[in-house]
Structure formats: C-alpha cells, structure tokens
C-alpha cells in the first residue's frame, strides 16, 4: 500500500538546517518539543530472534509487518524532528513557527512547521501541530497541510494520547509533487492514534488508498503490556479478481520472550451485518521461532487441510 520508507524526512530537515540554528531555547519551547511523538512512543516492540530456515511462516509475516509499521513510524516522526533539533523561527504567545524555508527537493515549494499550545486544565496540556507546504511567493492562504497532529498530556509531559495524520491527496490536489515518491502514489491519507498514558500502550495506524486501488485500506492495531507481551492485528480490505469485497485479518500475540501465535482469517461478507469469518491458518512458535503447531485450511502443495504439531503447545 505504501512503501516501507516514505522518503520525506530529509527535505524538512535539510531545509531547516539551512535557515535555523541551535541554542536560544526558552523554557516554554521545551513544552512544544516534549509534545511531539518520538519513535519509541509508537513503535511496535517485540523480542526478535534470529530466523531459521524453518521459522514459522506466520512468525516471519508478523516480523515483516512490525518492520513495515516501524519504518513508517520512523518517517512520520522524522517529519517533525526538526522541532526538537532547532529553535523556532518565530514565537507568538502560545504559537511557535519553524520556517518557512525552501524545499531542497522542490525549489518551487517552501515548507513550515506550526505548533499551537492550549491548556485543558492545570495538569493537562494540549498541543496541535502542522507541517505545511505552499508554492514560493504565495500568501498565507496557499499553505496546505501535509501532516497534522495533536497531543494531550496525562500525568507527565511524555505520557498521554495523540494523533498523526498524513494528507497525501490534499497536497497532491494542490500541485505538490507527492507522487514522485512511489510509496505515496496510491495513498489518499494515513491516520495514527496512540495512547501511552498507561499500560497497555495502544497504537492504531490506518492507511486509506485512492478509490482506484485494489487494496483500498489497511489497519494496524498494536498493544503492549508492562511485561513486554504484545498483540498486533492487521486488517486489509479490498476486492477479489472477480470484484467480490473481502477482508483479511492477521492477529499475532507474543510473550515478552518473543514466543507467540498468529492466526489468519478472512471475512467473506464484509458488507453484511453478520460477518462470515473463515480461519485460513494458525502458527504457534517457541523462542527458536520454529512452529510447534501449524494449521492451514488449504495446504500450498496439496490444496487440502493440513495440521502439524499439537495445538496444546500454543501459548495463546
């Protein structure tokens, strides 16, 4: 749906380096910096083991999904890391602005980062932020938001709940050459919500593609417990080659050690009130990542149901 790396953080950071410097922070600037999500706030954490030639297929699929998810997190947080590394260009009460500065990649465009602070209560701080682009020489009405987000603290500056939104089609419509990145050609928008105020930590990432793409949307849902155990689901919604809507789901669960289980299901009636869920397969694995139990509704070779190992070995 989108590439593992969005390849966008560099043009923000390079432009900022050219026009801003380090130092001269005010104490209030720290509030703005602390409100922005870091990679560790929303990345999936799973104890990864060295893969083997016979590692469980669904363990490998889980590992691949985590890598894809975390790479997208790196790129999204990279877009706003400039706020942590450099002083604001302007300060106006509860607002901070970085830029505008020219885009290294597209000289006809310029970029800015805007943050706005508001106080919900004496112990809760709310922050909104925007990464925006516009053609050089245009007025304020020409700014279009590429990325928007918000954060609300709970208990401390680094714990709370927030959202991040990437608006690929909005900047595409405005003429920004977003489709130069192959990973964004099919993307309409991407949404992330997260809450790290208490365990379990939760993160949801929803990818919405343009209506013309076969895979129209996908959703990652992740939760992490205090003991390091976790759970991740990935839903993919699209149509078959005969035009029939279908939803596939993989749900993976693991202990802090990395041992776990994954189930692959399909909803054959996603548009009906009562779903028709079909279990396509299950893998359970130990610390060595090798399947202790494996079930397939259709074996890839024989095309008949197959089972190896005992389901009693599954930890979930």
Task: Provide a role label for each language-model segment.
Residues 129-131, 162-163, 201-206, 262-266, ...:
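Short polybasic amphipathic segments
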Residues 1-20:
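Sec-dependent bacterial lipoprotein signal peptides
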Residues 79-177:
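Short N-terminal edge-element motif at the start of the domain
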Residues 16, 20-22, 282, 312:
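Secreted/extracellular small peptides and ectodomain modules produced from precursors
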Residues 255-316:
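Hydrophilic extracytoplasmic domains
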Residues 22-125, 293-316:
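N-terminal "mature head" segments of proteins
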Residues 144-251:
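Short helix-loop boundary/capping segments
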